[in-house]
């Protein structure tokens, strides 16, 4: 399992621990990932995704999972999230006809 958010694309960053004496040792900054179940109002389906804690609040701020997915940039989404977005758009179009 990769340490990457499926909705925002936030991944592992690398840097240094710096002590008081300025010695530098390499370290990894890992994202705070959570496995979350999102429920789509449009498709009435549940989707389990590995997302960062910051992304969870972004989804809530956007007005829910469907609103976030419709606004989301495809470049940041994982292949699973792209398929979910496509399914949401298709279902929304079918319901509007």
Curated annotation (Swiss-Prot):
Cystine connections: none
GO biological process, alphabetically ordered: translation
UniProt entry tagged with the keyword DNA damage: no
Keyword Ribosomal protein among record annotations: yes
One Gene Ontology term of the molecular function aspect: structural constituent of ribosome
Protein keywords: Ribonucleoprotein, Ribosomal protein
SUPFAM superfamilies from the UniProt entry: L28p-like
Assigned GO CC terms: cytosolic large ribosomal subunit
InterPro entries named in the record: Ribosomal_bL28 (IPR026569), Ribosomal_bL28/bL31-like_sf (IPR034704), Ribosomal_bL28_bact-type (IPR001383), Ribosomal_bL28_sf (IPR037147)
Pfam families referenced in this protein's UniProt entry, alphabetically: Ribosomal_L28
HAMAP family given in the database record: Ribosomal_bL28
NCBIfam families: L28 (TIGR00009)
Family: Belongs to the bacterial ribosomal protein bL28 family.
Designated name of the protein: Large ribosomal subunit protein bL28
Organism: Rickettsia bellii (strain OSU 85-389)
Gene: rpmB
């Amino acid at each position: 399992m990769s340490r990457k958010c499926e909705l925002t694309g936030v991944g592992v960053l690398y840097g240094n621990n710096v002590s008081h004496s300025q010695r530098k040792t390499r370290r990894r900054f890992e994202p705070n990932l959570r496995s979350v179940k999102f429920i789509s109002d449009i498709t009435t389906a549940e989707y389990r995704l590995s997302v960062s804690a910051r992304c969870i609040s972004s989804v809530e701020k956007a007005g829910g999972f469907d609103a976030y997915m419709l606004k989301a940039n495809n470049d940041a989404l994982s292949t699973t999230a792209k398929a979910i977005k496509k399914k949401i758009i298709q279902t929304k179009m079918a319901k509007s006809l």
